[in-house]
Amino acid sequence: MELQLALDLVNIPEAIELVKEVEQYIDVVEIGTPVVINEGLRAVKEIKEAFPQLKVLADLKIMDAGGYEIMKASEAGADIITVLGATDDATIKGAVEEAKKQKKKILVDMINVKDIESRAKEIDALGVDYICVHTGYDLQAEGKNSFEELTTIKNTVKNAKTAIAGGIKLDTLPEVIQQKPDLVIVGGGITSAADKAETASKMKQLIVQG
């Protein structure tokens, strides 16, 4: 089980400062979609250069032109790139093919997929590396989370690793860990904490204890 820090509402210098505080406790640093929109893939490049020991995920949420966008993110230094589960199989296949060429990983984000179980089965057959259940900001505001969906993909997915994102905090982490996802993605649960290093340290401890 690995811990991923999601960075969404920062610029590049702020991102670097934030990662410095918690780098010893995290395995993956995510350059979130808002950061990519504001800063471009330069953000991926600069974080990878600053923290070569960490895996960097580029949250591109690819919906089309899978191969091309994977190629560009790979050139910037991304280790893992996201594709949306709601896209068509051709886009996912193109992304997987290019990722294999570049020796990179694909994480499929199941945000807003209505039938998680049947779509996860289909995607699992396409050779992706991770399948991630994800409750976005707008639904988190309505009090929703992806904990039940995690159970569904844990029971369904046979080849890919499993991941969960959206609204995970220190007090809800034990519930997530019970399901044994391969990757736990935390954003505000760390970035909004008064003591980020202490929170990340406690989260990592819980994850290691598993």
Curated annotation (Swiss-Prot):
> What Enzyme Commission number(s) apply to this enzyme?
4.1.2.43
Q: In which pathway does it act?
A: One-carbon metabolism; formaldehyde assimilation via RuMP pathway; D-fructose 6-phosphate from D-ribulose 5-phosphate and formaldehyde: step 1/2
Instruction: Tell me which Pfam families the record gives.
Output: OMPdecase
Positions of transmembrane segments: none
Enzyme class comes to: lyase
Which BP terms does GO give this entry? 'de novo' pyrimidine nucleobase biosynthetic process; formaldehyde assimilation via ribulose monophosphate cycle; L-ascorbic acid catabolic process; one-carbon metabolic process; response to toxic substance
Q: What catalytic activity does the UniProt entry give for this protein?
A: D-ribulose 5-phosphate + formaldehyde = D-arabino-hex-3-ulose 6-phosphate
Recorded protein name is: 3-hexulose-6-phosphate synthase
Q: What molecular functions are annotated in GO for this chain?
A: 3-dehydro-L-gulonate-6-phosphate decarboxylase activity; hexulose-6-phosphate synthase activity; orotidine-5'-phosphate decarboxylase activity
UniProt keyword list: Carbohydrate metabolism, Detoxification, Lyase, One-carbon metabolism
Q: Which InterPro entries match?
A: 3-hexulose-6-phosphate_synth, Aldolase_TIM, HPS/KGPDC, OMPdeCOase_dom, RibuloseP-bd_barrel
Task: Kindly give the CDD domains that the UniProt entry links to this protein.
Answer: KGPDC_HPS (cd04726)
| Gene name per UniProt | hxlA
Q: What induces it?
A: By formaldehyde, under the control of HxlR. Not induced by methanol, formate, or methylamine.
Entry keyword Lyase? yes
Entry annotated with the keyword Mitochondrion: no
Query: What species is given as this protein's source?
Result: Bacillus subtilis (strain 168)
Q: Its family?
A: Belongs to the HPS/KGPDC family. HPS subfamily.
Q: What does this protein do?
A: Catalyzes the condensation of ribulose 5-phosphate with formaldehyde to form 3-hexulose 6-phosphate. Together with HxlB, may act as a formaldehyde detoxification system.
